[in-house]
Amino acid sequence: MNSPRDLRRRIKSITSTAQLTKAMEMVAASKMRKAQEAAIVARPFGRLVYAIQREATTHMGDFKHPLLEVREVRKRAVILVGADKGLCGPLNSNVLRMATKFDPKTTTFITAGRRAAQFIARTQRQLAAEFSYGDSPTYAEARAIAGLARDLFLKNEVDQVQIVATRFVNTLTQIPVTLEFLPIGEIHGLELPTTKPSTSEPSADDTEFAFEPSPEFVMSYLLLHYLNIYIYEVLVNAKASEQSARMVSMKNATDNADKLIKDLNLEYNKLRQGNITKEMLEIAGGKAG
């Protein structure tokens, strides 16, 4: 049976832990909001790219481009996007588990995030390069990753490039996904589904475009930027997912600590009350004697 001193020591220790997890929860919540805001700021540019692509396609005939070339897949590259840190529940393990489905003999990995790089090194899989990205992913970080993947594809070192990452749905839901990257199929976006377009934003669909010198020239230029924008949206989704999962994980830890503290306080008070009652009975018995 625990002594009052042991219980006080445990209560003090768990209280300190609860204060730490609460602080980490608040930090993660702040970073999550920033990641979502970054996605909102980038969204109009993404929408414009997709609208221009759709319009340019209607003005072109049989348009061919190396980034659109579909080849028999003998070797592939996978851009594996993970978190930099842990304490975010099953988020990392869910993404890394999907990476194990690829044949290690024919797959080379490009990693983004420390946990992804550590996993590839630990499992001794082929690694083309590893990248890092901050709490607020930048376009330059996305461009570096997209550039390497594009070069591998254009040099015929790989026949296909896919992405394994986490799609942010909401604070409680993050879904590990496998996305097609190269060759480029239908151009589309990875918008955060929890955010809505601002009514003040101009609609790209209502805009008339004039292509100079030609739709084909514009499309060739557009495809390169599309790859960068797509990776940027993937990174923003991954970071929002990481911070959301960490916030929920820390909130659960804080709630569990609070419940444990409550139970220990109850046990401590019962033990203390029992000791007081015992002492009073001993005193009363002594006087009676």
Where are these regions (language model features)?
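C-terminal beta-strand-loop-alpha-helix "lid" module of Rossmann-like NAD(P)-dependent dehydrogenases
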Residues: M1-G289
